[in-house]
Design a protein with these regions (language model features):
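Hydrophobic positions in the central parallel beta-sheet of the AAA+
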Residues: 81, 117-120
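Pre-Walker A (pre-P-loop) alpha-helix and adjacent loop at the N terminus of AAA/AAA+ ATPase modules
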Residues: 11-53, 241-246
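Interdomain "pre-motor" coupling segment immediately N-terminal to P-loop NTPase/helicase cores
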Residues: 1-10
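Conserved RecA-like P-loop NTPase ATPase core
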Residues: 27, 35, 64, 95, ...
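Canonical AAA+ ATPase core
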Residues: 101-105, 121-129, 137-193, 204
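Walker A/P-loop
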Residues: 47-81
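C-terminal alpha-helical "lid" subdomain
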Residues: 72, 80-81, 174-178, 187-255
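AAA+/P-loop NTPase substrate/partner-engagement loops
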Residues: 73-101
Length: 255
């Protein structure tokens, strides 16, 4: 079954991504350039085979956010699948196709909003499932027992929390590793990037929590530098703001 028409990568989309990426994902300028290089062959339909990209590095550095932003620019929601869940027979039916009316990956592909796919923690699935994706990565065709789906001009992003290329090769194996068009490392955040993330999150939340305390904000920014990633920084700020708000409600001594 052929795909419905999806927005293609255009020069305008490339320009917008280049200009605005750093507002969405802080501290990953190198990754931005490599992402743009990777998707460029799709500009204005030059290439019909999907571009398959592996994003690796610690969690909370912007891998998922990068894919979400790309999907927004391509007109809708990301098709996101959590591969760490694919560990049993039920998963085999989902990936390879079970009964015709049973929920399957092929059906989800047909129902997707955009041509941007995210396979989160791709390395965590049982390795037997990787073989189901060889043809999709090579030719843009996904075939199970019931459906044949043509997925032309797609951007397929896989994520992994491994730290090095050698680890990825060892755990994923060469048959799938060699099918990636681009392998992009997301680096650990610098102190400046962490402060910037904290600053942005403070601005986003301070009105909701009715907090305007410069001294507190400066302390939070200093504390942010000791955190590992954006997720931890956001938790730190939310927890701190919640505590301050509770103290206002309950009185200083009650919390």
């Amino acid at each position: 079954e052929t795909q419905q028409p999806y927005l293609e990568v255009s020069k305008e989309m490339i320009q917008t991504f280049n200009r605005q990426y750093s507002e969405r994902v802080i501290g990953q300028e190198k990754s931005k350039k490599k992402l743009l290089q990777a998707i460029y062959p799709l500009v204005d339909g030059k290439q019909s085979k999907p571009v398959v990209i592996l994003l690796y590095g610690d969690s909370g550095l912007g891998k998922t956010e990068s894919a979400q932003y790309m999907a927004e620019l391509m007109g809708g929601k990301l098709l996101r699948k959590q591969f760490s869940m694919y560990q049993n027979n039920e998963s085999a039916n989902y990936i390879f196709g079970g009964r015709y009316n049973e929920k399957s990956f092929a059906q989800d592909l047909l129902a997707r909003e955009t041509n941007v796919l995210l396979f989160d923690e791709f390395d965590k699935a049982l390795s037997i499932f990787h073989s189901a994706f060889y043809q999709l990565f090579d030719e843009g065709i996904y075939e199970d027992h019931n459906y044949k789906v043509v997925v032309n001009k797609a951007i397929i992003m896989c994520t992994s929390n491994y730290k090095t290329i050698d680890e990825i090769k060892e755990h994923l194996g060469l048959p799938i590793y060699n099918r990636f068009d681009s392998i992009i490392k997301f680096n650990d955040l610098s102190g400046i990037a962490k402060e910037k993330i904290a600053e942005r999150e403070i601005e986003r939340l301070k009105e909701d929590y009715d907090i305007e305390d410069r001294e507190l904000f400066d302390k939070i920014k200093k504390g942010a530098v000791t955190q590992s990633n954006a997720r931890e920084i956001k938790h730190l700020i939310k927890d701190t703001f919640s505590l301050v708000a509770l103290k206002k409600i309950c009185g200083e001594t009650e919390v």
